[in-house]
Amino acid sequence: MESRISGHTKLFCLIGSPVGHSGSPAMYNYTFERLGIDAAYMAFDVPLEQVEAGVEAIKTLGVGGFNVTMPDKTAVSHLVDELSPAAKLIGACNTVTVDENGKLTGHNTDGVGFVRNLHEHGVELAAQCCEHLNR
């Protein structure tokens, strides 16, 4: 039994389908443990046809926030209370934050991460045209 999990441990998660291959639980749980954060991260296989029920379950369980992968990104953007400017522009969200009142805000970090990675590898986008395709 995991000794660091208690009745006070905050749960965070990934939803989408399939998620069994995701490295996110290992990455987040390692980070939580190293930083002494009383939290756990799990991946839940939530097919598109069950995404609404999945988001309702997340609300009911008081999950602290969650990530979204395909095929649920667009559907989740219609189930949150608010969208960040990037999520509105893209029409999908990959990260959902939950405030102290349970309000869900959808964000999309795909575009920012893509551009940051290009910049870190010496690719300057000024005056260039590119298209980000998300499957």
Regions found by a protein language model. Give the residues of each.
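Glycine-rich phosphate/diphosphate-binding loop of Rossmann-like nucleotide-binding domains
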Residues: 127-135
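Phosphate/diphosphate ligand-binding glycine-rich loop within oxidoreductases
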Residues: 4-126
